[in-house]
């Protein structure tokens, strides 16, 4: 996606977020409609604003939660984000049939999560098992490997290892198709699958603290 289009989308989502917040504040009795709650909760997740997402979830009346299963679905995505469970984020997003008002936000969240995962792997690893990498970015193995080869990474079909390249400074927030790494690191011995995903999770926590 071109950077200009991403910027336009980001502006639109930011504007929609402001509108939803105002609608909640101005709602009779302080109780907004389910569509407003759904969009607002999803937008907070897209902004990675977990504090506001949690506060919103707590103040949504239980009766509205019970009568609108989509709200619980959105929050289940938020729980995966909170747990830094990248594979779980994609699985949970894909498991739900979202409404027309929420679907574009969830698609944007999935894409943003994928770009973030690509960037994190490029920072944290000199080599990673292709299957683990694919799970982390939420793509089939073949598609994930093809994508990184187009970005100048390397892949070994014999060992099924992906060899990332370190990103240029300041490129983490740009579109993946404009993400051009600089240096080529030397490969290191692989570590077991579960340990790799755990290490990535720890690295995410390190970057956020």
From Swiss-Prot:
Component of the COP9 signalosome complex (CSN), a complex involved in various cellular and developmental processes. The CSN complex is an essential regulator of the ubiquitin (Ubl) conjugation pathway by mediating the deneddylation of the cullin subunits of SCF-type E3 ligase complexes, leading to decrease the Ubl ligase activity of SCF-type complexes such as SCF, CSA or DDB2. The complex is also involved in phosphorylation of p53/TP53, c-jun/JUN, IkappaBalpha/NFKBIA, ITPK1 and IRF8/ICSBP, possibly via its association with CK2 and PKD kinases. PROSITE patterns: PCI (PS50250). Keywords: Cytoplasm, Nucleus, Phosphoprotein, Signalosome. It is found in: Cytoplasm; Nucleus. It holds the Pfam family CSN8_PSD8_EIF3K. The keyword Cytoplasm applies. This is COP9 signalosome complex subunit 8. Widely expressed. The modification Phosphoserine is found at residue 175. InterPro entries: COP9_CSN8, CSN8_PSD8_EIF3K, PCI_dom. The gene is Cops8. The lineage of its organism: Eukaryota, Metazoa, Chordata, Craniata, Vertebrata. Belongs to the CSN8 family.
């Amino acid at each position: 996606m071109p950077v200009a289009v991403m910027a336009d989308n980001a502006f639109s989502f930011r504007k929609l977020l402001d509108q939803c917040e105002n609608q909640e504040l101005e709602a009779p009795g302080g109780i907004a409609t389910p569509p407003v709650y759904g969009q607002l909760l999803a937008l907070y997740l897209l902004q990675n604003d977990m504090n506001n997402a949690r506060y919103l979830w707590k103040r949504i009346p239980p009766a509205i939660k019970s009568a609108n299963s989509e709200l619980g679905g959105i929050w289940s995505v938020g729980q995966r984000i909170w747990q830094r469970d990248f594979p779980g984020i994609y699985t949970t997003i894909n498991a739900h049939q979202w409404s027309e008002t929420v679907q574009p936000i969830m698609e944007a969240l999935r894409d943003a999560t994928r770009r973030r995962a690509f960037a994190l792997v490029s920072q944290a690893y000199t080599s990673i098992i292709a299957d683990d990498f694919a799970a982390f970015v939420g793509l089939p193995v073949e598609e994930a490997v093809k994508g990184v080869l187009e970005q100048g990474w390397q892949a070994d079909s014999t060992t099924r290892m992906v060899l990332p390249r370190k990103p240029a400074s300041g490129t983490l927030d740009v579109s993946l198709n404009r993400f051009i790494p600089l240096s080529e690191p030397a490969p290191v011995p692989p570590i077991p699958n579960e340990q790799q995903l755990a290490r990535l999770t720890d690295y995410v926590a390190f970057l956020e603290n």
